[in-house]
């Protein structure tokens, strides 16, 4: 049973592909959701953020995400400090969840890790699945979904790994510009092939 790391840039279809894997009986984990959990109220991650950045980044004992996002968007050293807090906590929690899921003997496990290319392949990932699409399609999808101006989406894209960098770490590439049913068949084929290896 393999653990796949699923990654792709903003607007690449990560949520859709995760759902397609779930439709095939494959449990999935979301690193972003785990990141939210490790900084929830009364969690050690939140206390560490308060120690590092100050209580101005908390509102009623909870993380003020908008304020922290603004800081790290404009300050590379603050972003690095936040990642130094979050990444070990996210990795530890993800490993715990994977071990729990393995006891159920699923066909595979998929962990959505948006920043996998930037942060490196974690030890618990056997193979990396990269979602690929043309940059113009990516931009259109992200603008439509997030209802943000093109300039804001472009800024996010520029902070992420490039398409070439993502493709360089890929063990498997899924083209998310194709019709949903074709993508579903690609996932079924991938699972069938890898179950027999």
UniProtKB/Swiss-Prot annotation:
Main location: cytoplasm
Protein task: Catalyzes the phosphorylation of the 3'-hydroxyl group of dephosphocoenzyme A to form coenzyme A.
Annotated residues for binding of ATP: 11-16
Gene Ontology MF annotations: ATP binding; dephospho-CoA kinase activity
InterPro entries in the cross-refs: Depp_CoAkinase (IPR001977), P-loop_NTPase (IPR027417)
Organism: Hydrogenovibrio crunogenus (strain DSM 25203 / XCL-2) (Thiomicrospira crunogena)
GO cellular component terms attached to this protein's record: cytoplasm
One Pfam family per UniProt: CoaE
Family, per entry: Belongs to the CoaE family.
GO biological process, one term: coenzyme A biosynthetic process
Enzyme class: transferase
Protein name: Dephospho-CoA kinase
Known catalytic reactions: 3'-dephospho-CoA + ATP = ADP + CoA + H(+)
Keywords, sorted A to Z: ATP-binding, Coenzyme A biosynthesis, Cytoplasm, Kinase, Nucleotide-binding, Transferase
HAMAP family, sorted: Dephospho_CoA_kinase
Lineage of producing organism: Bacteria, Pseudomonadati, Pseudomonadota, Gammaproteobacteria, Thiotrichales
Statement: the UniProt record of this protein carries the keyword Metal-binding: no
The protein's Enzyme Commission number: 2.7.1.24
UniProt domain DPCK: residue ranges: 3-197
